């Protein structure tokens, strides 16, 4: 079997202008970035806006094992399958962050014969959107310290500056730093730190804005810190939001690429789902819904994280209504959640599998009962999966009235996902009710945390230190109580302890910190030891990457 990068290099790509033309986009509606990448103008073909929206399909997953379950691969495979069946399909994905690319994950553009291409470009810089977002974020950071240095007319308290700097890399050494050392000429010394760019509020604003004007307004509302008297200071107070918008004027346009089977794919934005809201941009999703009859998108990590935020933040804000949900699972991950050791996941273990299916059952309950979406299970099959194991999963899901479809798109491309696509179409045809939210906007922030913790995570209680609870109450009293919440926690467990697999019982959600995102219009609830700046693993993927004598990238995936 060829590696992902070898498969991608063997592909015969079509010019992206041809893909755009088939979507109804003329040459004036796109900006080419070479032959195989383009950006779609925000005012592309005004007549498209009169088109009815297509059907929206969400792909999510169970709580991931360390190896991942193939959610992006399934999203691509399903889109290809729909296209093969004569449907006008468009795929919507997030852009990869280079932190995980060089860290633990490697490439993030699908896998096997279900990939988006050009794979190397997508994983390495792409069209420069993340660099633009980082520049806009760090411009604001520079203007904060510059304002303090030149007289501090706004009376910003350096001890209460909440706006960190960002880079698109995993670097634990930058989590806490001291800036302004070396004398008066270098500014006022204060504690600072770095987040990874996908955790930036600018990224969240970028992905939730519905126009360039809305982007500018949201950027202006970003709270960067507080004055000595406790009043919030915004990017607009610093007159930074206009220049920030200038840096993002091209990045805000959705990126158009293609799959190995030439299905159009829009990749735009990339917030993580464990430390941010985990969805691609509203602009890209809305554009895709006008261009295609069926739009396949994903939300990061498991259905407890990305899917919850997709529903409670993105869909609520943008007025989106998903028509069906695909929950991705693997036999090996279910055995992992049943207590099997990572080294033993390729061996049949009916006992571990039986226990681990509880994790899938909880995600099914969340999707169907709490989010109100009809669901199907896409079981990504591996060679070592046995018939007995497959039969057990199908039996347990059948008892819940949920169909399990064995998916083989990794090995067979769209042809391996046609059965999955056919069942998704059946779910859409039988759709009769709208999406449900986990909580109402009218509930208090603390009530919202409790709703998600108890309903979605199965927690028995929520705890927060007194200063954190006081900050939540302060935000409530300041008029931010109607905002949705964005819980930052580990992706590996329903609890805040990554080692507690399956469906932990009697666990408590512990809130460590809270962060206001007034531009994105949500409140981040940070739990336990989750980090907004990841670190590299002991053996990062960067170790195996290189350039050969022909200038070809090796070891990317």
UniProtKB/Swiss-Prot annotation:
ATP binds at residues 65-72. It comes from the Bacteria. GO terms for biological process: tetrahydrofolate interconversion. Its EC number is 6.3.4.3. Keywords: ATP-binding, Ligase, Nucleotide-binding, One-carbon metabolism. It catalyses: (6S)-5,6,7,8-tetrahydrofolate + formate + ATP = (6R)-10-formyltetrahydrofolate + ADP + phosphate. Pathway: One-carbon metabolism; tetrahydrofolate interconversion. PROSITE patterns: FTHFS_1, FTHFS_2. It holds the Pfam family FTHFS. GO terms for molecular function: ATP binding; formate-tetrahydrofolate ligase activity. It is an enzyme of class 6 (ligase). NCBIfam families: PRK13505.1. Belongs to the formate--tetrahydrofolate ligase family. This is Formate--tetrahydrofolate ligase. It comes from Methylobacillus flagellatus (strain ATCC 51484 / DSM 6875 / VKM B-1610 / KT).
């Amino acid at each position: 079997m060829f590696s992902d990068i070898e498969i991608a290099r063997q592909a015969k790509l079509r010019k992206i202008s041809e893909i755009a033309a088939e979507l109804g986009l003329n040459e004036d509606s796109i900006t080419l970035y070479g032959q195989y990448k383009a950006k779609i103008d925000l005012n592309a073909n005004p007549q498209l806006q009169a088109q009815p929206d297509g059907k929206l399909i969400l792909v999510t997953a169970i709580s991931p094992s360390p190896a991942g379950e193939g959610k992006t691969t399934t999203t691509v495979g399903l889109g290809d399958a729909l296209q093969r069946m004569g449907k006008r399909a468009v795929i919507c994905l997030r852009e990869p962050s280079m932190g995980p690319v060089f860290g633990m994950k490697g490439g993030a553009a699908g896998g096997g014969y279900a990939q988006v291409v050009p794979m190397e470009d997508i994983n390495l810089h792409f069209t420069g959107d993340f660099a633009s977002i980082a520049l806009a974020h760090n411009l604001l950071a520079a203007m904060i310290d510059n304002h303090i240095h030149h007289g501090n007319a706004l009376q910003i308290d350096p001890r209460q500056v909440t706006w960190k700097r960002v880079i698109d890399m995993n670097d634990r050494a930058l989590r806490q730093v001291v800036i302004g050392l070396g004398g008066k000429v270098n500014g006022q010394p204060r504690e600072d730190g770095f987040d990874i760019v996908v955790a930036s509020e600018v990224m969240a604003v970028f992905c939730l804005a519905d126009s360039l004007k809305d982007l500018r307004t949201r950027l202006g509302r970003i709270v960067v810190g507080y004055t000595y008297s406790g009043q919030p200071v915004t990017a607009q107070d610093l007159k930074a939001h206009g220049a920030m918008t200038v840096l993002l004027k091209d990045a805000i346009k959705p990126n158009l690429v293609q799959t190995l089977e030439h299905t159009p794919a829009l990749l735009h934005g990339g917030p993580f789902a464990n430390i941010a809201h985990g969805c691609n941009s509203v602009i890209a999703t809305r554009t895709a819904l006008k261009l295609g009859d069926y739009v396949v998108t994903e939300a990061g990590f498991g259905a407890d994280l990305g899917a919850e935020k997709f529903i409670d933040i993105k869909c609520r804000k943008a007025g989106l209504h998903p028509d069906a949900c695909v929950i991705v699972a693997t036999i090996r991950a279910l055995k992992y959640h049943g207590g099997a050791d990572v080294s033993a996941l390729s061996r049949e273990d009916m006992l571990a599998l039986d226990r681990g299916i509880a994790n899938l059952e909880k995600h099914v309950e969340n999707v169907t009962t709490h989010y109100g979406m009809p669901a199907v299970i896409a079981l990504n099959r591996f060679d070592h999966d046995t018939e007995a194991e497959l039969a057990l999963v199908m039996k347990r899901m059948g008892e819940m009235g949920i169909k399990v479809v064995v998916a083989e798109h990794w090995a067979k491309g769209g042809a391996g996902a046609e059965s999955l696509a056919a069942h998704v179409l059946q779910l859409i045809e039988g759709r009769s009710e709208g999406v449900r939210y986990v909580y109402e906007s009218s509930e208090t922030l603390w009530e919202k945390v409790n709703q998600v913790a108890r309903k979605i995570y199965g927690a028995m209680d929520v705890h927060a230190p007194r200063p954190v609870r006081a900050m939540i109450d302060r935000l409530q009293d300041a008029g931010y109580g109607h905002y949705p919440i964005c819980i930052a926690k580990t992706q590996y467990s329903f609890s805040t302890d990554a080692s507690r697999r399956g469906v932990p019982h009697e666990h408590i959600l512990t809130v460590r910190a809270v962060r206001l995102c007034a531009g994105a219009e949500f409140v981040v609830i940070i739990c336990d030891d989750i980090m907004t700046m990841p670190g590299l693993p002991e053996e990062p993927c960067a170790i195996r990457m290189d350039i050969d004598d022909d200038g070809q990238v090796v070891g990317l995936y």
